[in-house]
Regions:
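Junction motif at the cytosolic side of a transmembrane helix
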Residues: 168-190
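Membrane-interfacial segments
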Residues: 15, 19, 59, 63-68, ...
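Transmembrane alpha-helix boundary/hinge residues in polytopic small-molecule transporters
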Residues: 19, 54, 92, 108-109
């Protein structure tokens, strides 16, 4: 939630305060402004995601002793890397939606709804309709697990997606809002 709010606030805060005009005066090429915001946000989100997992490992290591994961274990290292990439994807999705909506409340509401609310009705509907379960598996929070949790067996028959398909869908959730934001931002008045 932190990186989603940060992603939305990076641009909606400028729109609400009128600072977007100053930003566009300093960087008149809108694509470059969007790209720079996306790059800085991606670095910060990756560091927040990976850093929080590393910090929780460091705090829990003395208590768990030999039961704590090892940083040399590939599964745990992949979890750290995947958590960072997961945060990058969510932050970019929020940035794109923030550019599109230009409203802090609207962007945050939409992101939180996609991440935490949309799966609830789909989960109830999936008991009656198979398509609802498949759609639920394509939501950002569900496919993000393909990046960070390598222990999930994607070919066990309980998932209709493969791990690579889930990663591609998650990438689409991150990239499509940014591309749409670029298209709209380059043609719309500030």
């Amino acid at each position: 939630v932190v990186v989603a709010v940060l992603g939305a606030l990076i641009i909606t805060g400028e729109y609400s305060s009128g600072q977007i005009r100053s930003s566009l005066a300093a960087v008149p090429r809108r694509g470059r402004l969007l790209l720079s915001k996306a790059v800085v946000l991606s670095v910060v989100a990756f560091l927040l995601g990976s850093g929080s997992v590393l910090l929780s490992w460091a705090i829990s290591k003395p208590f768990l002793g030999e039961h704590a994961g090892s940083l040399t274990d590939w599964d745990y290292s992949a979890y750290i890397l995947g958590s960072g990439l997961d945060c990058v994807g969510i932050a970019l999705m929020a940035l794109g939606i923030g550019f599109l909506l230009r409203s802090t409340a609207g962007a945050i509401t939409m992101i939180v709804s996609l991440l935490f609310v949309a799966d609830l009705p789909l989960q109830m509907m999936s008991q009656k309709w198979e398509w609802a379960g498949k759609l639920m598996e394509c939501l950002p929070r569900s496919v993000a697990a393909a990046l960070s949790d390598l222990s999930i067996n994607w070919s066990d028959g309980t998932h209709f997606l493969t791990q690579s398909q889930a990663i591609a869908i998650f990438a689409a959730w991150a990239i499509i809002p940014v591309i749409a934001a670029w298209l709209v931002f380059s043609r719309r008045d500030a």
